[in-house]
Amino acid sequence: MSSSRRSRQASSSSRISDDQITDLISKLRQSIPEIRQNRRSNTVSASKVLQETCNYIRNLNKEADDLSDRLTQLLESIDPNSPQAAVIRSLING
Amino acid sequence: MASADKLINTDVPEKDVFALHFLRSLSNLRTQNPLNSPDKSIDRVRKIKKAAYVSMARAAGGNSRLWSRALLRRAAKDDNKSVRFSRRKRKVTWKISSKRRRSNQRAPVVEEAAERLRNLVPGGGGMETSKLMEETAHYIKCLSMQVKVMQCLVDGLSQK
């Protein structure tokens, strides 16, 4: 199943124009808060965008790790009678 | 060959969709693992992190995206605890797909950066570069949405 998907992608990717690549790169650029406007050639800025994207994803993964940690601690120590617990209960059951 | 200018959509659902999926995941965890279970703390953290990624993949559209499909498949394999064998299989898959991808190479400096990105995006190993970028744009939007949801939850629970 995965091999047929890959061959499908190989044939459809030849139809993706360079305009769409540029469009995707600009979309990526917009999604990343740190990246600054780059006046250099398209190739250089494309590689820089991809690099920044890698860093951004690594940061998000790290944040998710830290938040999972904190969330675990908070959920363990939550007092069942507190207002927070009531809010969570209503959100889950509602 | 002139291409049909298909609109590449990278829109993601609203934050409350992610929040709802995540809370449901958490409540399922609670049902399976009552508070006084003998689970080690690090296992609990791992379960919550996994719930975060799985609920994010579901909120983002489940099987409609390559990255979410790959993430959910990986999570299902983890549950069956056949991780070692499936990891070896995946490495072979990457070798085959990189041979196919060579026919669609962009500039080497771009491909080099794309390779690093492939290791970070679920299912990236089998994607051609342009598809990879489309999936990545969607993935990072969803990931940042999920992080926001978790931050809100932490903030809400931290108030005294």
Curated annotation (Swiss-Prot), chain A:
Source taxon at top rank: Eukaryota
GO cellular component, one term: plant-type vacuole
Tissue expression: Expressed in roots, leaves, stems and flowers.
Gene Ontology molecular function: any one: DNA-binding transcription factor activity
Keyword annotations: Gibberellin signaling pathway, Growth regulation, Nucleus, Transcription, Transcription regulation
Any one GO biological process: photomorphogenesis
SUPFAM superfamilies: HLH, helix-loop-helix DNA-binding domain (SSF47459)
Induction: Not induced by exogenous gibberellin.
InterPro entries the UniProt entry points to: bHLH_dom, HLH_DNA-bd_sf, PRE
Localization (cell): Nucleus
Record keyword Transferase present: no
Domain bHLH: 5-60
Keyword Transcription: yes
CDD domains: bHLH_AtPRE_like
Similarity comment: family membership: Belongs to the bHLH protein family.
Subunit structure of this chain's protein: Interacts with HFR1.
Stated role: Atypical and probable non DNA-binding bHLH transcription factor that integrates multiple signaling pathways to regulate cell elongation and plant development. Regulates light responses by binding and inhibiting the activity of the bHLH transcription factor HFR1, a critical regulator of light signaling and shade avoidance. May have a regulatory role in various aspects of gibberellin-dependent growth and development.
Comment field (misc): Plants over-expressing PRE2 show long hypocotyls, pale green and slightly narrow leaves, elongated petioles and early flowering. They are not sensitive to the gibberellin inhibitor paclobutrazol during seed germination.
PANTHER family: TRANSCRIPTION FACTOR PRE, TRANSCRIPTION FACTOR PRE2
Name the UniProt record assigns to this protein: Transcription factor PRE2
Organism from which the protein derives: Arabidopsis thaliana (Mouse-ear cress)
